[in-house]
Structures are given as C-alpha cells and as structure tokens.
Design a protein with these regions (language model features):
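Negatively charged, low-complexity tracts enriched in Asp/Glu with abundant Ser/Thr
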Residues: 1-35
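Hydrophobic beta-strand residues in large extracellular and virion-surface proteins
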Residues: 30, 37-39, 50-54, 78-80, ...
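A short, charged, amphipathic alpha-helix used as a generic interaction element across diverse proteins
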Residues: 63-71, 77-92
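Short aromatic-glycine-(Arg/Gly/Cys) micro-motifs in beta-strand/loop hairpins
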Residues: 37-72
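Short stretches within intrinsically disordered, low-complexity N-terminal or propeptide regions
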Residues: 10, 19, 42, 54-55, ...
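Residue-level detection of beta-strand scaffold positions
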Residues: 24-26, 52, 71-74, 88
C-alpha cells in the first residue's frame, strides 16, 4: 500500500468517487477545472488538524456525477482549511 492510499484510509476518504459522493460527506468540496479539491478535519493533538485531497476527473463528465480518482493527499496537516486549500491549488 503506498503512502497516499494509507493517508486516504487514515482520513477515511475514498480513492474513487463522484463529486456528489464527496459533497454529501464533507463540508468543503471545490470543483476547479479538471480537479476536485476536498478539505477535511482530522484531529491531531499538535493542533494541525486540516488536510487536503485532490481528485481528478476520470471521464468527460465533469458534473457532480462524473467519476473521479484520488491524485494527491497532503502529507502535512494544516492549521486551518484555508492553508489546506492553498496547498491543494498548488498541486499540479
């Protein structure tokens, strides 16, 4: 199992889904071009509890029902969701 898959399992996020699936389970889901960004909260005692995940569309359907796959998960946790979003937007 690679590090990205391990983090997805730890944060309890799917490796494949639809944007609609993410929106029903997570509060911050942003469609940005051919990517979908998810920002979540995962408690950690050091106080940095926010993480980000970047999904990419796997087909031509870029609606809420399009199929997406996990491309990146932040190894670092952030102090707030804004910094997590910033990280996600900077991923190629």
């Amino acid at each position: 199992m690679n590090k990205m898959t391990e983090l997805a399992k730890e944060y309890r996020i799917p490796t494949q889904a639809t944007p609609e699936d993410l929106e029903t389970r997570w509060g911050k889901v942003i469609t940005f071009g051919d990517r979908v960004i998810l920002v979540g909260y995962y408690y950690h005692p050091d106080g940095n509890c926010y993480f980000a995940a970047v999904y990419e569309f796997l087909d031509d359907d870029h609606t809420c029902e399009g199929f997406i796959g996990l491309r990146e998960v932040s190894y670092k946790r952030f102090e707030d969701d804004g910094h997590a979003i910033e990280w996600a937007l900077n991923q190629n």
